[in-house]
Curated annotation (Swiss-Prot):
SUPFAM superfamilies the UniProt entry points to: Nucleic acid-binding proteins
GO cellular component: mitochondrial small ribosomal subunit
Organism: Pongo abelii (Sumatran orangutan)
The protein's name in its UniProt record: Small ribosomal subunit protein uS12m
One matching Pfam family: Ribosom_S12_S23
Coiled coil location: none
Amino acid sequence: MSWSGPLRGLNTSLTCGPALVPRLWATCSMATLNQMHRLGGPPKRPPQKLGPTEGRPQLKGVVLCTFTRKPKKPNSANRKCCRVRLSTGQEAVCFIPGEGHTLQEHQIVLVEGGRTQDLPGVKLTVVRGKYDCGHVQKK
């Protein structure tokens, strides 16, 4: 039995005996030493971009100030936000979800990733019910 025995049932263009061997080599591009020297080897994958939490699910932070922001064009509201100094040393603007909050300066909050769609530049959200940020009150 020849080496093309198992391939006998396939398309005849693939099983034309020795003609298959050069096609296998043609698909594999091999770099010369000169090309490797010029191009510097295989391309390196750039490091994965991490968000403001640097790959962590949540971060602790201290509230620096609270304020309201206006959303982008089709929406209209006053979104409650706060500037937080994270445990990594960075400062970030965070969205405070829910109705009513009692956050003040120097209070400790837990912050998670998750941007607010209509607030440009706000990529973090305060977790309600953890540390100094209370739960949303029932009506």
